[in-house]
Amino acid sequence: MSQHRFVPRRSTLAAAALWVLTSPASAADAPGAPTPDSTVVVTGQKAPPATPLPSTVESVSAAQIEESINTVTAAGALQYLPSTHVRERYIGDRNGVLVMRVNSSIASAQTTVYADGLLLSNFLNNSFSTAPRWGMVSPEEIAGIETLYGPFSALYPGNSAGGVVRMITRTPTQFEAHVKLDLFGQRYKEYGTHDSFSGGHASASLGNAVNGLFYWVSADHLDNHGHPQTFGNTTAKTGAPAAAGSFTVVDSANVIRDIDTAGKPRIIVSSTGIDHTVQDIAKFKLGYRFSPALTAQVTLGIWQNASEGSVDSYLRDAKGNVVWNAGASFANPFKFVRIDGADYTVSAAAPSRSRSEHWMHGLNLKSNTGGAWDWELVASLYDQKKDLSRTATPSNGLDSGLGDVHPGGQLTDASGTGWRNLDLRGTWRLGAHTLDAGVHHDRYQLKSVTYGTATAPIADWLGSDTGTLNTNSYGQTQTEALYVQDAWQIAPAWLLVAGGRQEHWKAFDGSNYSAGNAAPNPKNLVYADRAQSNFSPKLSLSFQASPTLALRASLGKGVRYPTVAEMFQTFNGPNNIRTNDPSLRPEQVNSQEWVLQQQLPNGMLRGSFFFEDKRDALISQTDVSVTPNISSIQNVDKLRTQGVEVAWQLGDVGLRGLDLQGSVTYAHSIIVRDARNPGLEGTAQPRIPDWRATLVGTWHVSDAWSATLSYRFSGRQHNALFNTAIGAYNDPNPNVYGAVSHYSVFDAKLLYKINRQWSTSFGVNNLGNFKYYVNPNPYPQRTLFASLKYDL
């Protein structure tokens, strides 16, 4: 999205093209600094000459977020950037995976997210459950956001192969204070759930700068009742009818029948995962400018979450009692339910609760001489100080688990899990050369213990602090890197950026325990330490063909090492049972991007061809080359993704003050070679849509009023790998619950600036009430927003 409301004159546009593609472009290539064109941080200092940029950058400013985007979370601010989407299934979703050109909606370790250079990405796993820690940034403190596409900069790790998001937060230059209140809600209708789900958000912040000292203090509170995230469903028992006395007859008037993703009939029995989340963020930043050329800043962020996941059963017996569950482990008559003469089991109607407190510490030291040499140090520590999750195991069919007598269940304690990062970088400006070199260190630590087994659950799912050990998983990974990158202005129209990143990775202290393992399989496994080194070269050549036309070709390799959980944790995931494999090899990505950017009299048009070959891709699949077959996360020999992205920014379209920004992306992603499951060769990589599009139209009616109408589209994609057993994909019915469906969604927002201090806005997301899903979870339906803001 464009950074500015008014489109500059032609000469300025030509200069912008030169900045983006050929000239010294941006400190965005550094983890902690904004682009020179960003209106995101005003410090009053002299800005150093920028580091040339080898990749495409798209950005959105705080002003654009305020006037055109309905969001109360940092993740929501990215939804109109080209080929970019955050899997935010409801407001306050902790599993909001960042999706860009080439990664799926459950591949969280293939993109990288920073806030002021501090890493927010959670590389403990590559899963829907380890999304970036968006909650550490309040949307009101965002000054601007930039996205970088591809592994073309040596300054970032191999996890950046899918892309990089850099959030820059506010740094005050004088006293300022802000207060904002948001209300939002939806009337949600799906199956047997017809209800209103609403919430509120409040934030307050203040900052100041006096004699070189500056500070920022903010608090953010979110309270939201989310809509159901899953719907319990079942199919009829085959074979002999259930024995007399083992079943409960269910009133068929309450039964909801449906067709699943495979085109088969099913019965919807319950709604679950109805999450009431209360999240609080406290952020404190303190900095000091020792001189115009040296600044230090410390950051402390605390995020707390209290979540209650409730359930609702649609089934009633002849007396009107709610029937929650039925299965083999229950006493008669709740081994089955009988509906119109057919017998069914009913499961998954289990409530949950989680309590979390996470701490983030950051330190930035940066020189800013603007001369021949500058340097920067960024250190961060993320600590899951408390992370407890509880799930009930109902003891009979009429017990929801939320009554006066609490049944048993499971408790998972991930407290102490976390990561730390350190980067030290220098920049040398030597005539036609700008040289960046640095060192990097990171360490990730997994601690996860689950108490309560099927036969010996914890005594009280809400109150017990321990119980029979079910599983535990421990392990650490560490990466150390050296990198160098040289930007050489060969001639006024030619810029060559070349670099490389040498990484040494090791995995150690890995172990897990599973009470369910029976002899001869050991219950406790301890894994040998591993180490590996890789080199990733980068090359980019830019050419300013004319004052308004710029070209760039970029080549880059990225190495994405296995996460701690992929190697050392055993867990269940959608569509497959995934087991750990400590011998997994790193993904090796070779990417290309070919860019043409044309400045127009009233804007910009960019076209990008992108290409990615991924070797040893880490994917959950079934290994059919061994007997018995093994379903787990495995290395797949080769994946290929290629596509075209077109983006544009236009100002004063048809009438003064009407700005249009948009993008269209086509991608084709297939499995090229898979020795462990050859039947998958030539089939689609799941969760990569064929088409994506965005369009944002903002009319600045006056200095006080603006109105925005936006559009989001995502096309066909599969929710799982090709099913070689049936010779077809599992989702021929792709737009129902359980699928990763397409969507076509309109949003609108009206902003009114009452005066210099006060403003208010009203908005609607999903104007058409479009129903769409991300296997299996439904996205929000029509959602209304209202906001009131005060700025001092």
PLM ranges: what are they?
Residues 36-69, 94-97, 125:
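N-terminal periplasmic "start-of-domain" segments of outer-membrane beta-barrel proteins
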Residues 75-119:
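Extracytoplasmic beta-strand/coil segments of soluble accessory domains associated
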Residues 120-151:
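Short acidic/polar hinge/loop motifs at secondary-structure boundaries
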Residues 180, 489-496, 504-505, 602-614, ...:
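Gram-negative outer-membrane beta-barrel transporters
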Residues 195-310, 357-370, 431:
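Transmembrane beta-barrel wall of Gram-negative outer-membrane proteins
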Residues 287-303, 345-514, 542-544, 606-609, ...:
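Face-selective signature of the C-terminal outer-membrane beta-barrel domain
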Residues 346-360, 368, 470-479, 527-536, ...:
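Outer-membrane beta-barrel signature, preferentially recognizing the C-terminal barrel domain
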Residues 445-454, 458-463, 504-519, 529, ...:
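Surface-exposed extracellular loop regions of Gram-negative outer-membrane beta-barrel proteins
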